[in-house]
């Protein structure tokens, strides 16, 4: 349940109505039917299911009770309380979340599928899900033939902020220590571009932050805590594009701070109190960033373009050293891939919040984009698909 026209809100399920329930709460059986997320493979000819990978395992879901992210950033967790309640919530994995809603990447040579997973459930509130909540908020590598887990990289153990792995992973070769390594990159909601060895899942490096960061991984409070990026900030569902010519990965992102406030519906009759975390947009400037991240130099940002609205579409890099992206105000932009100079702009009449694509037909290269707007962000809506032809 999304509450708030900005798309920043909270999800809350209640078994029955009660005084004090906030607007947007789901009442009834929906509160009892949560399910773990999964990826599944089907035979294209027969439709038969071949395998299924569940995002939350029955064994080991609690993990190691990590106090840091894999790259060493501290997490504000109550480990003692989590361990004390582990026995009480041993079955939490059954409704543990980890929704799979992003497009995977495939390496046919390694026989691996790389996919992102969503945040744990209950969303934001962590009292009933002690542990790291594996394999939520993770980039996972699955055997393409069997669906077995080869490795995982959990970007945020025990997520309390909505930092699901939303942007699709991208494959490229990275240069590290004079060596060329087959890599997979993932642009995160936390504001970093992670680059991993796609054979082992080992972290090669993370980029410089491509959006402002404030109170990252701090625990939400009853007084309210402003955190940036928020649940819809950083790189959300926007696909990344990589150019072999420039060695740069191009990331579209959003600066959208959010206030996280812990609230409680009082106990009523025989019903216990219900705690939840409300998310509210912070008053103040919000903007988008298009960042060119150098994967040959450890993730330095070579250039960055700022847009007046958060970027929630995607990026297209071409062999002609152009980078295309769309804005919420309706502009489709073309930048110089190496310098970031804005070279061309076309107003599409509605928010350009889908990734551009390119193809060649009868010797002519086309760039095509959908301009449909975005109701969640309040961008002007439309129903156009617009094609541009590049000169021969």
Predicted feature locations:
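Generic structural signal for coil-to-beta-strand starts
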Residues: 1, 111-112, 192, 247-248, ...
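Residue position within the beta-strands of beta-propeller blades
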Residues: 2-4, 115, 186, 251, ...
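Chalcogenol-based redox active-site neighborhoods
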Residues: 11-12
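Extracytoplasmic/lumenal domain signature
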Residues: 15-26, 32, 39-94, 126-165, ...
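Structural signature of eukaryotic scaffold interfaces centered on beta-propeller domains
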Residues: 98-107, 170-178, 234-245, 315-317, ...
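Membrane-proximal interfacial segments on either side of biological membranes
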Residues: 204, 244-254
